[in-house]
């Protein structure tokens, strides 16, 4: 069975209640299903808190965080350090054997600089599946942060949705993007069950899909096209629905290729 990549984002990393719900659902799922799981995470809220504490400005361009050279070490520490190890601690608490990684480990995801104006922000491309497949075969849960490294040895901050997409392509995995919201909402706040590229374009033009959600939708569309299968955007808030979601039941917005 294809591995399943669960991309975590939003304020989930900031909420003990949410993490408890998520890891309880993961334990339940792993007990009754053989499907290998991989977690990919960002940690924007962890970074924002740290930047605020250090009085450093947070700038975004087209929904992507601008990462100057003097901030990449701080962001790496927040994502590959604090956020990653927090998730490993929760896995340990729930007796899940997990391994913390970043995109460069085992060359799992190749990263190049996306745009000089964004600074240390990386473009993620599929890499080698060997390391993660080896971990999955031995029963481990890989927990992968969205920090990458270029062939020149430059650390890069990668949008976590795009990192998860590249890793899904690497592993031939299915992908779920877990978010704060129950999916993509229309202008009246109602969840849209299915989304095509044409529909997304229309909603972006109408200003209904904005900011970070544009990046999320484009990443999901890119993933659906790359993987040749649908990708789900759903909420982590309803823990009781997560095992069914992990099993392929649509619970949020299903992005069609």
From Swiss-Prot:
**Where is substrate annotated to bind?**
43-44, 65, 157
Q: What is this protein called?
A: Acetylglutamate kinase
Q: Where is this gene product found?
A: Cytoplasm
Self-association state and partner proteins as the record states: Homodimer.
The protein's matches in Gene3D superfamilies, at most eight in alphabetical order, are given as:
Acetylglutamate kinase-like (3.40.1160.10)
For this UniProt entry, which residues form the secretion signal?
none
Q: Which reaction(s) does the protein catalyse, per the Swiss-Prot or TrEMBL entry?
A: N-acetyl-L-glutamate + ATP = N-acetyl-L-glutamyl 5-phosphate + ADP
Which residues are marked as site: Transition state stabilizer? 7, 216
Q: Could you name the Gene Ontology cellular component terms for this entry?
A: cytoplasm
An example GO BP is: L-arginine biosynthetic process
* Family, per entry: Belongs to the acetylglutamate kinase family. ArgB subfamily.
The record ties this protein, via PANTHER family, to:
N-ACETYLGLUTAMATE SYNTHASE, N-ACETYLGLUTAMATE SYNTHASE, MITOCHONDRIAL
Q: Which UniProt keywords apply?
A: Amino-acid biosynthesis, Arginine biosynthesis, ATP-binding, Cytoplasm, Kinase, Nucleotide-binding, Transferase
What the protein does comes down to: Catalyzes the ATP-dependent phosphorylation of N-acetyl-L-glutamate.
